[in-house]
Amino acid sequence: MKHLTKLLAAALLALGLNQAVWADDASDFRQTRQLAEQGNAEAQFSLGLMYDNGQGVRQDYAEAVKWYRQAAEQGDAKAQYNLGSMYYKGQGVRQDDAEAFRWYRQAAEQGHAGAQYNLGTMYENGQGVRQDYAEALKWYRKAAEQGDDDAQNNLGVMYAHGQGVRQDYAEALKWYRQAAEQGDAQAQYNLGAMYHNGHGVRRNFHLSKEWFGKACDGGVQEGCNQYRYLNQKGY
């Protein structure tokens, strides 16, 4: 689950708890629980986060699931996404790809980019649903168009390999570049490979080396290997 602390702070502010109040975790918890028990979906989501993150209360995944579910059943996309993640990871509930898929889909249909990306990966890998590259492409595109760098990279991969769509190196390059410019190390490596092989763009070893170097800095070992190779060749 991404950015729990940021999500928690934002959720508490949305409930009207000011900086001085939500600095006190125990006070946050009491106030949030009171609102959650009154049926406030945002508070239910926030309470789920608090249990999930162990903020103001002892960490308890089962309680997190309980409160995420209450908010999710009221249509809260963030709670649907987090509930899907609990099922996906088997935290506080038995691991269940089909249930993860069901909740991700509900959040994705409301425009939640993270859920759209996860739905894409589940369609691509056949997790909780029959493998379907065309559906994977569809959901990756939705997330990519919202700026999700992981989705942009995966969309590029699908265009590069012709999965769910006709192979198109120019489109692959476009999406790799968008992700790479956001700092996505795997996309930086993939963009370097496109320049190295001349796929969708004129071959350029200097630019290839530059992107491999960025990927290396981001922790992609093969980027380091390719950077050293090109450096030895004098590029």
What function would you assign to each model-found segment?
Residues 1-9:
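Bacterial N-terminal signal peptides that target proteins for export
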